[in-house]
Design a protein with these regions (language model features):
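Mid-chain, well-packed structural core segment of small domains
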Residues: 42-67
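Amphipathic alpha-helical interface surfaces
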Residues: 9, 31, 48-52
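C-terminal structural segments of small proteins and small subunits
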Residues: 70-85
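Alpha-helical scaffolds flanking conserved acidic
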Residues: 29-34, 64-68
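Acidic, glycine/proline-rich low-complexity segments that act as flexible tails and inter-domain linkers
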Residues: 1-30, 58, 82-95
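Short alpha-helical scaffolding segments that buttress acidic/His motifs in well-ordered protein cores
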Residues: 13-17, 34-41, 69-74
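Amphipathic alpha-helical segments within well-ordered protein domains
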Residues: 19-22, 36, 53-57, 67-71, ...
Length: 95
């Protein structure tokens, strides 16, 4: 039963997040990636942040842009959340 629920949730994520939202006009993938990094920092979601750091690189973001996004988030989300985000991003980037 739980496996079915998880599968259904993943289908929803794939359809809604990756299809409906990421496929919309108005923002390029690079900008969407940087927004997600800032939001995941604010929400303190380290696992998802690491996944989105990889995605950001694949979507054309530079390491400097990722760093600057996390610094920007630090001011508005708080230093503890930003420190966690920097640690996870550094691990993912191999820094």
């Amino acid at each position: 039963m739980l496996a079915t629920a998880v599968g259904s949730l993943q289908e929803l994520v794939t359809e809604y997040c990756w299809g409906a939202i990421w496929g919309r006009p108005g923002l390029d993938l690079k900008t969407r990636s940087l927004l997600n990094l800032a939001m995941l920092t604010a929400l303190s979601r380290p696992h998802e942040l690491r996944l989105h750091v990889r995605g950001a690189l694949n979507n054309g973001c530079t390491r400097e842009e990722i760093r600057e996004t996390l610094l920007q988030a630090a001011v508005y989300c708080g230093i503890p959340a930003a420190l966690d985000a920097f640690r996870n991003a550094a691990d993912e980037l191999g820094d």
